[in-house]
Amino acid sequence: DLIPATYTFDLSDGEFRHVRGTLEVKEGTTLTAQLPAGQWIKSVGIGIDNYWKTYGEMPKQDVTAAEGTYLIPDHSYRSLYPYFEPGDGVDTTNIRVYKAGDPNGNKARGWESKAVALTDSVESNSLKNADVVCEARLKGGTYEQYQTYTLHLIRTPSLSDLAAADSVSGLTLSPVYANTTDTYTVATSQDQVKITPTALCSGAAITVAGKSTQSGSPVTVNLADCEQDSGKNYLIPVVLTANGQSVTYTVKVQKRASTPVILNHDEGLDVKVYSQTGDCIEPTSSTGTADTYMLTLGCGYTYLATKDVYYHAEHAFPAQPGMTLTVPTPVTDDWLTGLSAKTVNSAP
C-alpha cells in the first residue's frame, strides 16, 4: 500500500526493456504502462578517435542484445565514439540514444555516426575498467519507454616507448615507435640484442621473448633462440598483460654482416662516428690518420670531425663493403666576426 503522494517508477522485463515516469497516487489509482517491444539498438561499434580515422574499430566480445564487452587501449582519451546501428523498423527520428546519468543528457547521440563523442567514458592513460549504460529513449506519451545497452569497457595495456640495442650501439626501430604500430624492424650484425619496453601505465605484466621484465628494463635476447619468419628475420615478441588481456608487439631483427669502413683524415683531427640513435662508436683500430670501424652493412652512420674545438665537418653515410672515406678538415676561418646583445623594452 502507498500513501497518497507523487512517485517515480521504473518497470522492466528483467532484461533491457523499460518504462518509467511519475505517478500521482490517490485512493484507487491504477498504473497502466506499456514496455517497449523489439530491439531498438541492433549493434554497437566503438572507436577511440573521431570517425575512427587512426585506430579503427575496437575489438568486441560477448555481445548480446543488452550488452557487449569492448577492449579499449589505455592510451585512449576520455571520450569514445560509438556507432549505434538501429534495429529493423526503428523510428530514428523519435527514438534517440543517450548516455544514462549524463548531466548533459539533453544531447542525443546520432544513429550510425562515428563523429559524436560519448564524453567522460573512461580515464585517460589508465588501465581502469568502466561500465557505461546507454539508453535508446522514445520521447512523447505519458511515460518514457527506453531500452538499455551496457558497454563493458576493458582497458588493454600499451607501450609508451620501445628501444633496441646491441653491444655496439642503439638500434633504429623502423618505423619509429608509435601506439598505432605493433611490428618493428631493426638490423644488427651481433648475435644478441637488448630490448627495452616501457609501459604507458603501471600494473601491466611484461615479457620479452618469454622473459619477465619490468617497465624500462632491458632484456638480452639471443637471436639463436628466436623463431624466424619466411624472410629469415628473427622474431622477438614483447607481450603486455593487464585486466586479463594481452597485447603483443613484435620486433623483427635482420641479421646483417659487419663491414670495415675506413676514415682517412689529417693528423690531429678529432673524428667520431655516431649511430642513428646517437651512440658514439669506437674504432677497432686507429693509426692517427686512419680509423677503421666495423659497422653493420647497410645501416646509416654519421661522422663528426672537430678542429680546434669550434670548427666542425659532418657527413652521413650508409655502411658499404670496401668503403673508405676521406674526412675533410674543417675550415678554421672565423665566419662570425662579431656578436652583440642588447636589452629590448618589450612594454607596450
Task: Spell out what each predicted region is.
Residues T329-D333:
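Intrinsic-disorder/low-complexity linker and hinge segments
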Residues L11, D291, L295-G298, Y303-Y311:
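Amphipathic, non-membrane alpha-helical rod segments
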Residues L35-A37, E282, K307:
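Disulfide-rich extracellular modules and peptides
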Residues D1, D62-T64, Y274-L295:
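Short, acidic Ser/Thr/Gly-rich low-complexity loop/linker segments typical of extracellular
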Residues L2-T6, L11-L269, Q276, Y311-H312, ...:
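Beta-rich interaction/scaffold domains
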